[in-house]
A protein has these predicted regions:
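Left-handed beta-helix
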Residues: 1-81
Length: 81
């Protein structure tokens, strides 16, 4: 697992191979193996746990809302509820 300087990870489970880029915020979520979280992306929140599936990429500046279950990569700047 790699969490770059400036990234925030709080109350989250990060499986093997996960990379969280600088400026990303990961909160109350489960990231499966080999997930890449782009710079400035936001995953989860204070509510229900968000899930991101194996090998997916959450692009730079993208948002995955609390409680979301993600089975496909999320494009840069995209929002998933």
């Amino acid at each position: 697992v790699v969490v770059e300087e400036g990234a925030t990870v709080e109350d989250a489970v990060l499986m093997d191979g996960v990379v969280v880029k600088a400026g990303a915020v990961v909160k109350r979520c489960i990231l499966a193996e080999d997930v890449v979280v782009g710079a400035g992306a936001k995953i989860g929140g204070d509510g229900a746990i968000a899930h991101v599936g194996t090998g997916l990429t959450v692009g730079a500046g993208a948002t995955v809302k609390e409680g979301a279950k993600v089975f496909d990569s999320v494009k840069e700047g995209e929002e998933v509820c």
